[in-house]
UniProtKB/Swiss-Prot annotation:
Role: Catalyzes the single-oxidation or sequential double oxidation reaction of carbohydrates primarily at carbon-2 and/or carbon-3 with the concomitant reduction of the flavin. Accepts only a narrow range of electron acceptors such as substituted benzoquinones and complexed metal ions and reacts extremely slowly with O(2) as acceptor.
Gene3D superfamilies from the UniProt entry: FAD/NAD(P)-binding domain, Glucose Oxidase, domain 3
The family this protein is said to belong to: Belongs to the GMC oxidoreductase family.
Protein name from the UniProt record: Pyranose dehydrogenase
Record lineage: Eukaryota, Fungi, Dikarya, Basidiomycota, Agaricomycotina
Annotated positions of the Tele-8alpha-FAD histidine modification: H123
GO cellular component: extracellular region
Subcellular location: Secreted
First-tier enzyme category under EC: oxidoreductase
Amino acid sequence: MARFNARLFSIAILGFQVARSAITYQHPDDLPGDVDYDFIVAGGGTAGLVVASRLGENSKWNVLVIEAGPSNKDVFATRVPGLAETLPTSHIDWNYTTVPQQALGGRSLNYSRAMILGGCSTHNGMVYTRGSKDDWNKWADVTGNRDLSWDSILPIMKKVEKFSEDFSDQSVEGHIDPSVHGNDGKLSVVASYTNVSFNDLLLETTKELVDEFPFKLDMNDGNPVGLTWNQYTIDHNAERSSSATAYLESTGDNVHVLLNTRVTRIVPTGKTNFRTVEFAVDAGGPRKQLTAKKEVILSGGFIASPQILMNSGIGDQEALKAVGVDTLVNNPSVGKNVSDQAATLVLFDTTLPNTDFDVDAAIVEWNNSHAGPLATGAPLNHLIWVRLSDDKLSGSDPSSGKDSPHIEFQFSKISHRIPPANVPNQVALPSQDSIGVVIQFSVVNLNSISRGSVSLNDNNPFSHPLIDLNMLGEEQDIAILREGVHSARRMLSSEAFKPFVNGSVHPPANITSDEDLDAFLHTTTKSYLHGVGTLSMSPQNASWGVVDPDFRVKGTTGLRVVDASVIPSVPAGHTQTPVYAFAEYASIVIAKSYN
């Protein structure tokens, strides 16, 4: 007997209209045998659910999404903004590990990626940043696709958004520029903030050190440099907004979602026509196949998508041969060009009030009223985007342009509690007993020029691939991160902070020279988990790259890729918003090709 299917519906009594939504299936055996799917989306993450939802707006098309993880509705913590930090390393995480990183003293880094419906939009820190105008214009130049230029993509980014005040109904005046935001989209975005004294000190610093830390009203206007209020993908009800909640839940019942099932390969239906998806529940289970009438859209993310392509015989011929995979399309660019951000955590001793709270009590409060400390994205609510002066750059400018930042400061909390050493990507920090209350934030090199790779470990689709970030592989990357630490120290040495900050704890205050700071960074740098580029988009007839400007995999028909892997380089910001924008744009491109 088939397992229970979740057909979610609501009946509007007036007019007797029935509003149906996507149908979910827990096991491949539950799939209906009488449905031919026009499109099969391999991966139900941030991009995959956007594409499935948009294609599903055509009621004549049947769409199937195959997702390796469970439903987001099964995991309470994915709903609560303040519980985001509990999700990495949990059962809804792929729990990847990189190969030893040469420039990090041979350390292997944990690499968190979501394995759940909604992907990283269900699992991340919810920060909503578009990147700079320069980023988008650079991508347009690199790919030969002018539709990706800032002026062309901005209407699509605004189309994504449903911007509103947060649960507290605090005015957003002075925190955002309403003219650069959308109000009618699917994805909820808020300028969520808490009233803490730290905010006032930061704003005072923008007046004192205006050249380095100017105040920026809205970081999402395309010119993000400066200190700005954070924006989050949280709805007015203080719940996380993700591609699962914002897109899938408003989708018709012509969209089917198969959960807990791994896509193993894309199989050719002809010599270069790849429209058949192979999938299985586990490594020992039977492999099943379904063929899309029109196309397969691969949306596994920047690690899983190249792994699936390589297991399908699309990749570097010599590398595939080495692991026993027959080459069907020889493309050495598959899995190359990993572009990511390097970061380090800094701690400053302070007499400011801490932002700690009783988590159990906060969960009760959130359950009862959707308010309290767990209703916001973080206890501290600012980001700073720093552009280094030319004299502080080591070599050529790695940013996308003159209006783009090199460094990000992301503030997290003021606390005596510091992350344990087993937190993903984390390294040993000062012992709890050796410090008091500390201001905690990340210093991020936004423009790493080092490039890494994702490659097959073997020909078992259920094995983790080899992930080499080549973190700090170029000297310029560590030089910029070092300048970021210097900049952070200047900020917290300002007149505004002097009465409240007693110096740097991590790195220790006695580490001041460039040489000593570099040694510190080699042992403490981690990934900021914003990897892109493994299946990079490139011009139509380019000799490099994996997908054309229409997202089709070069050398194939019937197969496109839509996710972070196609973005050529990491933006000067977080990657969530660009992935939404790429997915919305791809949906338009795909639909138009069948119009």
